Amino acid sequence: MFKIKAGDGSNNLTGKRVAALRREQHLSQRKLAERMQLLGFDVDHYFIRRVENGERFVTDIDLVIFSRALNVPVAELLSAADADL
């Protein structure tokens, strides 16, 4: 089965950006997961790790919840995407 991947073999284009924004805000993966849970998204810190490491595909719903939890526009999560293709 053919799977689309980023140029670096990652399953998403946003994981590195999520990690950078999370670190800029001095949040642990667990704290980011807690923020997402408060928004009604049932995730744990393993979900965050898998996204940041490029192990998990990211849906449009994931992008919206990440943007709300990190208080940034969705476009900010995709800002480095062109370079990774």
Briefly describe each language-model feature range.
Residues 2-8, 68, 75-85:
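Short, charged recognition helix plus adjacent turn
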Residues 55, 59-76:
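DNA major-groove recognition helix of helix-turn-helix/homeodomain DNA-binding modules
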Residues 21, 35, 51, 80:
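Residues in the recognition helix of alpha-helical DNA-binding motifs
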Residues 23, 34, 68:
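Alpha-helical residues within the helix-turn-helix
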Residues 13-16, 27, 43, 58-61:
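Residue-level signal for the short linker/turn that defines the boundary of a DNA-recognition helix
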Residues 1-25:
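A short, Lys/Arg-rich alpha-helix, primarily the initiator
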Residues 26-50:
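Short alpha-helical DNA-recognition segment
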